[in-house]
């Protein structure tokens, strides 16, 4: 998919409008609680053309996959629907759906009009027989997946969570012969090339508004930071001296933390760039290498990697956003790197080396409990959280070549997202 087609497809979001809904309902669920049983019957096609039938099937498949991925909703098996009457959107028999243990019912209707498809999705609470929310979307064939993702995001909003299904993952790939920046849907679909250079571009990082990607490029001879607006296609050089890498936007989008060798001795230190004034401030002052900054969701702290305990033994530290109050948070083992702060604020995922295997671990900052996410004897690296804190994307050599995978916060539901070329350094929009 080309970038132009991707941006055109995004326009479907602007055509969405809400149907009349009752008072807002927010369903709450916490980790460890049972998931919400969700019924998603086949979409009712009002104009039964082959194109409309295919469009309805695609939307239903993507919606079901999104719900299954959520860790919030449990789609009911299709076989359950055979025990009750077929769905009639004009007269819903809620007792039927309650009999197969559905708590929520998501209905869909679709019609074709002049080569475009109009989809109406509605969500009901089965036990109370209440209509909760409805949405209408219009799209051509290329925008059907986006329609499904947007409807799935409405389900997440009911749960009071950040939507994740319309988010993007930026990454580096050599599938076209050179390391370039790409982006793809959360599930690996619709990979789209962002940069077009004949020299390495790497370490992409999303801005909070999801419009800009910061990255490092060697196009000017050294490793410099650039900002690329993915909608306008414009780029801005924001560093000119030293080696600059590992950029990370602050949650408010006003500052860019990064690692640079700007010091006279060429040592790697962490800086914060004020993006309005375009002035950098040095945050770390240590003879060791300080790198891989990651902001806390409040923007008041930064986690980072440093080998100040000894070369070859990196550890995870945390400091205030102005560089003060530095303290070590990792423990056990002698190699911890690449911290990524969860959007929930209570956890940091990082890479740890044990017996020459690089695996991902999650440290709970409140309890000091550690959960191992990966079990493969491979290079598992560059973790990045989903916006809701329920999933982690990372790159791994478990298949032989570097590819991008996702895994849930508890180490379950491992999924491979890429296959062409080598793919690495993923960064999920926040």
Description of each model-found segment:
Residues 28-93, 106, 110:
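Short beta-strand->alpha-helix linker/helix-N-cap micro-motif
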Residues 169, 213, 253-257, 299-303, ...:
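Hydrophobic beta-strand positions that form the internal "hydrophobic ladder"
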Residues 127, 185-189, 229-233, 274-278, ...:
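Short loop/turn segments that connect beta-strands within beta-propeller blades
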């Amino acid at each position: 998919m080309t970038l132009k087609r991707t941006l055109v497809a995004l326009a479907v979001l602007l055509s969405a409008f809400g149907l009349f809904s009752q008072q807002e309902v927010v369903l709450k669920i916490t980790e460890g609680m049972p998931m919400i049983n969700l019924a998603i019957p086949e979409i009712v096609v009002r104009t039964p053309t082959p194109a409309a039938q295919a469009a309805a099937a695609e939307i239903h498949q993507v919606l079901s996959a999104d719900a299954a991925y959520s860790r919030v909703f449990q789609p009911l098996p299709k076989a359950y629907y055979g025990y009750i009457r077929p769905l009639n959107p004009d007269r819903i028999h809620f007792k039927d759906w309650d009999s197969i243990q559905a708590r929520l019912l998501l209905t869909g209707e679709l019609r074709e009009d002049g080569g475009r498809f109009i989809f109406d999705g509605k969500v009901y609470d089965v036990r109370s027989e209440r209509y909760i929310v409805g949405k209408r979307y219009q799209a051509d064939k290329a925008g059907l997946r986006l329609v499904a993702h947007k409807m799935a995001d409405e389900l997440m909003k009911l749960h009071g969570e950040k939507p994740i299904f319309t988010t993007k993952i930026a990454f580096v790939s050599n599938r076209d012969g050179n390391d370039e920046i790409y982006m793809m849907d959360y599930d690996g679909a619709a990979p789209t090339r962002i940069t077009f250079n004949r020299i390495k571009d790497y370490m992409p990082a999303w801005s909070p508004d999801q419009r800009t990607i910061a990255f490092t490029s060697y196009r000017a001879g050294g490793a410099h930071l650039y900002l690329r607006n993915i909608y306008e296609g414009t780029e801005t050089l924001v560093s000119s001296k030293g080696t600059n890498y590992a950029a990370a936007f602050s949650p408010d989008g006003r500052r860019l933390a990064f690692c640079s060798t700007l010091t006279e001795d060429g040592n790697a230190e962490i800086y914060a760039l004020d993006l309005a004034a375009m002035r950098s401030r040095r945050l770390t002052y240590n003879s060791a290498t300080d790198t891989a900054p990651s902001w806390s969701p409040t923007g008041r702290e930064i986690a980072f990697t440093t080998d100040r305990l000894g070369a070859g033994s990196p550890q995870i530290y945390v400091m205030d956003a102005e560089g003060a109050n530095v303290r070590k948070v990792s423990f056990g083992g002698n190699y911890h790197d690449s911290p990524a702060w969860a959007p929930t604020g209570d956890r940091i995922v990082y890479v740890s080396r044990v017996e020459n295997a690089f695996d991902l671990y999650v440290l709970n900052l409140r309890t000091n409990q550690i959960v191992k996410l990966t079990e493969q004897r491979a290079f598992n690296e560059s973790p990045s959280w989903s916006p809701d804190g329920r999933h982690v994307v990372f790159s791994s050599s478990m298949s032989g070549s570097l590819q991008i995978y996702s895994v849930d916060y508890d180490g379950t539901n491992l999924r491979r997202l890429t296959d062409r070329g080598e793919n690495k350094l993923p960064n999920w929009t926040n």
